[in-house]
A protein has these predicted regions:
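A conserved acidic beta->alpha catalytic loop
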Residues: 8, 24-33, 49
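Short beta-strand/loop segment that forms part of the nucleotide-sugar
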Residues: 17-26, 45-47
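The conserved acidic donor/metal-binding loop of glycosyltransferases
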Residues: 73-77
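Short, well-formed alpha-helical segments that are part of the catalytic scaffolds
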Residues: 1-13
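Conserved donor NDP-sugar-binding/catalytic core segment of glycosyltransferases
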Residues: 79-115, 120-123, 127
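Glycine-rich, basic loop-to-helix element that forms the pyrophosphate-binding segment
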Residues: 46-64
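Short aromatic/hydrophobic "clamp" motif used to bind/position activated sugar donors
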Residues: 69
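Short, flexible, basic/aromatic active-site loop/helix in glycosyltransferases
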Residues: 120-145
Length: 145
């Protein structure tokens, strides 16, 4: 997945406002070697053991110490200028704690993706919830959000 998706993150990153950091959560595949040999501009934080999904992210966020952290799974591609509006919104709205971009389906980019209920709204506590999904149907992206 790294070879398929990470290039879009590297190519579409604005290095004036963000570093690309891959956190390896104790993987047993060759992810660390791929990052070191094929993605020289990417920073690598490698844990010796797998701390699980939430604890792995939390440890990385604490250790990296950035003002903002943006979490992407390894199966996410991004488009040009995806990051700037999120950053600008956070900078201009200090009372906002979380933002997310529009998330589209990888198999059909005219539809939203709702993996884990993301792709909709985030409530005041930072929990994502769906908008535009009714049971077994998924809303088409017509630029409405």
């Amino acid at each position: 997945m790294l070879r398929r998706y990470l290039p879009s993150v590297v190519e579409n990153n604005n290095d004036q406002i963000a570093d690309v950091v891959v956190v390896d959560n104790g993987s047993t595949d060759n992810s660390v070697e791929i990052i070191k040999s094929e993605f020289s501009t990417v920073k690598l934080l490698a844990f010796n053991e797998n701390y699980g999904f939430a604890e792995g992210y939390n440890r990385a966020i604490r250790q990296l110490g950035y003002k903002y952290s943006l979490l992407l799974n390894s199966d996410v591609a991004v488009s040009p200028h995806w990051l700037e509006p999120l950053y600008k919104y956070l900078e201009e709205n200090r009372d906002v704690a979380a933002v997310q971009p529009k998330i589209l389906s990888d198999s059909d980019r005219t539809y939203f993706e709702y993996a884990g209920a993301c792709g909709g709204f985030i409530d005041k506590h930072g929990y994502p919830y769906c908008r535009g999904r009714v049971f077994d149907s998924v809303e088409n992206d017509n630029g409405q959000y």
